[in-house]
Each structure stands twice: as C-alpha cells, then as structure tokens.
C-alpha cells in the first residue's frame, strides 16, 4: 500500500476518524491493530518476522535491565562480603560480560535474519561465479526469498531500542504490546525514519484529544510532503531517467 495511493488515503482517513472516536485508553491498542493490519496487507506472513524482531529485543531488554538491577541490589546488600575492591570490580565485570554477550547475541540473530533475506542470493551468485572461474561444475541453487517489506527499518529500530536499554539511556518497556507498537508503527514501517524510543514512545502511548490546530498543522505537512514527492521528486525522476537512457 503506497503512501501516495488512494487506498492509503482512504485507510488513513478511516483510521484518523476512529482514533478520535474510541475511548482514549484504547488509542494505543488501536494504533497497534491497524499497524499490524497495514503490514499484513503487504503479505499475510510478514507480521511473523515483525513479531520475532520485537520479541527478541523485548526479552533481551528486560533481561539486561533486570540483571543489572539484581547486581546493584546484591552489591548494596552484600558490600561487606567483598574481600577487596578488585573482587567487587571482577564481580561487576562478570555481570557486564553476561549482559554484553546477550546483547550481542540478540544483535547477531536479527542481523542474521536480515542478512539472509537481503544478501543470501548475492552470496550464492558470487560463489557460483567462483566455482565457474575454477572450472567446477558445481552450482548452488538460489533461495529466491521474498524480502519482507520494511525489514531493514524495523530491524534497526529494534536494535536501537536494545542498545539504548543496554547503555541505560532508557528503561526497558515492560509491556510487550507497547514495545511491538513502537517497532511496528505503520507511518514509518516501510520508508522510515528509524526513530529513537525516547523520541517516539510517549507520543504513541499517551492519550490524545482532538485538537483542530494540530490537525490542520498535520494536514499541511502531509500536503507539503505529497507536493515534494509527486511534483518535485517524480518530475526529477522522469527527467533523470530519460537523460540516463542516452
């Protein structure tokens, strides 16, 4: 569903109307439902990858934060049991190593999934070229995987969240569905931008009342964006495409 399509305009109009008609406590769950529905409209199985990415970073973030709090509590309550500052330092280093290992493992899992979808056939193509160059008849079959829409955006947004938790810039989100909304929020799911949790979360989760001035301001920004896309960018694309043909 392209942002410039009539289907998307109809979708956003209905979503906007319902968002301000439902009880305000249900606004963020409503955003989650329509975001998942929006993504599923591109491919019924696509939300599975979105859920996996969200679950990995959600669970890893919770464990990292909980482990750090438990470590601090243990040190505070058992400060006298450490024989020296060096022993206390080594204890903290062991805890930090466990948290770092989990964080790196989560990063590698998500990057591996992204890499398989984006670069598996590229790697296979180069390996086949090497086989051909050395005179081998061996040829690997292409995977022909269909790249899930927006997987790069939500993968890096999920990883950004996890890194912020690890660096103690934010608290881990305790509600999985709120975390899922942050990862899957439909206006940025396909074309970005990649947002920081600290910048977006409060706006997503808080209750909103209809504000005419804000709505007009939002419509002005949308129309300006459409102008830049349909009039400026598409015109330049047509001109450059024609130029590059010659």
Language model features with spans:
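Membrane-embedded transmembrane alpha-helical bundles that form the catalytic cores
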Residues: 1-246
């Amino acid at each position: 569903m392209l942002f410039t399509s009539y289907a998307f305009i109809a979708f956003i109009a209905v979503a906007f109307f319902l968002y301000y008609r439902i009880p305000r406590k249900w606004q963020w769950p409503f955003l989650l439902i329509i975001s998942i529905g929006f993504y599923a409209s591109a491919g019924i199985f696509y939300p599975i990858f979105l859920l996996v990415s969200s679950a990995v970073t959600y669970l890893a973030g919770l464990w990292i934060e909980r482990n750090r709090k438990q470590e601090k509590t243990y040190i505070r309550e058992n400060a006298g049991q450490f024989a020296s500052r060096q022993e206390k330092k080594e204890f903290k280093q062991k805890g930090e190593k466990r948290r770092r290992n989990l964080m790196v493992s989560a990063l590698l899992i998500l990057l591996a999934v992204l890499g398989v979808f984006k670069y598996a056939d590229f790697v296979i193509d180069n390996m086949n070229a090497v086989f051909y160059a050395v005179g081998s008849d061996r040829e690997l079959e292409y995977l022909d995987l269909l790249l899930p829409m927006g997987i790069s955006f939500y993968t890096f947004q999920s990883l950004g969240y996890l890194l912020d938790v690890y660096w103690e810039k934010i608290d881990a989100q305790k509600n999985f569905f709120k975390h899922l909304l942050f990862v899957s929020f439909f206006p940025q799911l396909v074309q970005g931008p990649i947002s920081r949790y600290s910048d977006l979360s409060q706006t997503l989760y808080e209750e909103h009342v209809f504000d005419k001035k804000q709505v007009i301001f939002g419509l002005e920004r949308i129309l300006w964006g459409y102008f830049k896309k349909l009039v400026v960018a598409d015109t330049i694309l047509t001109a450059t495409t024609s130029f590059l043909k010659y």
